[in-house]
Amino acid sequence: RRDFESLEEGIDALMTDVTDKLRKIKPDIMIEFRQSYVGPSIRKYGNMFRVTDCPCDAQLNRRGIIDLRFTSGKTAVHSDMLMWNVADTKESVAYQLTSVLYGVPQISMLIDKLPKEHYRTLKHYLDFWREHREILLDGKLTAQSPESFYNQVCSCLDGEAVITVYNN
């Protein structure tokens, strides 16, 4: 005897039951899913999607964010944890940060241990992100050249746009 006719029905019942019980305990609970098992149908169970692990790889982080944004509707898309070597140039730090502008950046560095140039660069781009967050996260997203890790990305909202061009 089967409880469900298909694996999909069983998984849906399990996930629905788990998320319903968690939301009864904490109505505003954050439930995160990682990129490797995210798709449009999983949106009803979670409220946060994160790019799969790609340490120190700005291009994969950017591609992961854009891929998730295209399939995730209004669900929040978070970058993989950003990290870099403290010996890196400020330009390298900026590249990591500009590559995650269209998602929610997650910084995995000890802020108080950063070189001053890195701290200023981080502050600059996080200030930019905060100022333009609505456009970046809620705007109509377009991107070119997935084979080049989306080297041109644009988000438009209410007559304003943020456009980035990356030289991979």
Q: Whereabouts are the PLM-identified features?
A:
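The substrate-binding groove and active-site-proximal loops of carbohydrate-active enzymes
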Residues: 1-12, 84
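Active-site-proximal substrate-binding groove within the catalytic cores of carbohydrate-active enzymes
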Residues: 14-168
